[in-house]
C-alpha cells in the first residue's frame, strides 16, 4: 500500500491503510492539534533526525490493561522497602531529556529529536502529556512520560539509571490510572520488558474500538502534579 504524504490539512488516512510494519503517513507537523488527533485515531509519530516525520499505526498493538499488571517478587521487595520516592509532573523536562539520551544500540540514534521534545513539552503545558519520576536520595534516577486522553494513557518512553527505577514508576502510574478509572495503557511497540510486566498484543481493530469507547468527544488537559502515589503523598 502507498504511504500517504500529509499536508497542512488536519487529517490522517484510515489506520487500516498502514504498511505491514505499521507505517501510515509521512510529513505534516507536530502541532498539539495534530498530535491529539493522531492519538485519538491510534496513530503516533516515530522518526529520527535523518528522516521526515513518520506516523505509525502498528498491527498488532501492545497494550497493558491496568488490572493485568504483573509485579515480580523482587520488585515487590523493592516497593516494600520504599527505595524510591515517586512524583507526577514534577520534572517533565528532565524526564523527556533523559529519555532522549537513551540511544538505540544499532545506530546510536534517538527518536526523541528536538522537535519531539518541543512538541511534547507543549502538550505537557496544556495538561495532556505527563511524567512520572522516580527519585533516590534526591536524584532523578528513572521515570517515564506519555499522553493521557479520556481513560487511555499512551506511554511514550522511559529511562532508568538505577535498577528497577522505571519499573517502580510504572507501578505507581498504574495505581494512579486505576484510581482514575483509566482502562488502557498503549505501549505502542512490542518489547519483552513490557510483556514481562503484563502487556500483551491485541489487534488494531480492537485497539481502535477501545479508543472509541474510552475517549470522549471533548477532552480537557489537567496537571497531575501533587497526585498521591499508591495512596500516599509524594
UniProtKB/Swiss-Prot annotation:
The UniProt entry's GO biological process terms, in alphabetical order, are: protein catabolic process
Return the EC number: 2.3.2.6
Gene3D superfamilies from the UniProt entry: Leucyl/phenylalanyl-tRNA-protein transferase, C-terminal domain, Leucyl/phenylalanyl-tRNA-protein transferase, N-terminal domain
Give the enzyme class: transferase
Is the keyword Magnesium in the record?
A: no
Keyword Transferase listed? The answer is: yes
Task: Report the family membership.
Answer: Belongs to the L/F-transferase family.
This protein is called Leucyl/phenylalanyl-tRNA--protein transferase
Species, as recorded: Syntrophobacter fumaroxidans (strain DSM 10017 / MPOB)
What are the top taxonomic ranks of the organism?
Answer: Bacteria, Pseudomonadati, Thermodesulfobacteriota, Syntrophobacteria, Syntrophobacterales
Amino acid at each position: 500500500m502507498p504511504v500517504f504524504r500529509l499536508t497542512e490539512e488536519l487529517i490522517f488516512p484510515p489506520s487500516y491503510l498502514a504498511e505491514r510494519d505499521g507505517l501510515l503517513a509521512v510529513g505534516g507537523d507536530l502541532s498539539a492539534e495534530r498530535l491529539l488527533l493522531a492519538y485519538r485515531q491510534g496513530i503516533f509519530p516515530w522518526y529520527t533526525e535523518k528522516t521526515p516525520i513518520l506516523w505509525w499505526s502498528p498491527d498488532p498493538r501492545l497494550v497493558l490493561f491496568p488490572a493485568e499488571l504483573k509485579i515480580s517478587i523482587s520488585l515487590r521487595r523493592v516497593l516494600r522497602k520504599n527505595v524510591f520516592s515517586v512524583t507526577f509532573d514534577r520534572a517533565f523536562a528532565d524526564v523527556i531529556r533523559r529519555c532522549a539520551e537513551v540511544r538505540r544500540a544499532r545506530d546510536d540514534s534517538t527518536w526523541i529529536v528536538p522537535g519531539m521534545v518541543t512538541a511534547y513539552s507543549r502538550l505537557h503545558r496544556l495538561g495532556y502529556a505527563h511524567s512520572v519520576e522516580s527519585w533516590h536520595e534526591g536524584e532523578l534516577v528513572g521515570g517515564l512520560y506519555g499522553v493521557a486522553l479520556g481513560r487511555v494513557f499512551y506511554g511514550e518512553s522511559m529511562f532508568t539509571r538505577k535498577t528497577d527505577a522505571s519499573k517502580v514508576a510504572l507501578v505507581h502510574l498504574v495505581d494512579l490510572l486505576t484510581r482514575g478509572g483509566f482502562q488502557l495503557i498503549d505501549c505502542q511497540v512490542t518489547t519483552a520488558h513490557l510483556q514481562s510486566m503484563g502487556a500483551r498484543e491485541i489487534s488494531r481493530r480492537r485497539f481502535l474500538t477501545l479508543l472509541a469507547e474510552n475517549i470522549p468527544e471533548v477532552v480537557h488537559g489537567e496537571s497531575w502534579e501533587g497526585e498521591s502515589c499508591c495512596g500516599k503523598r509524594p
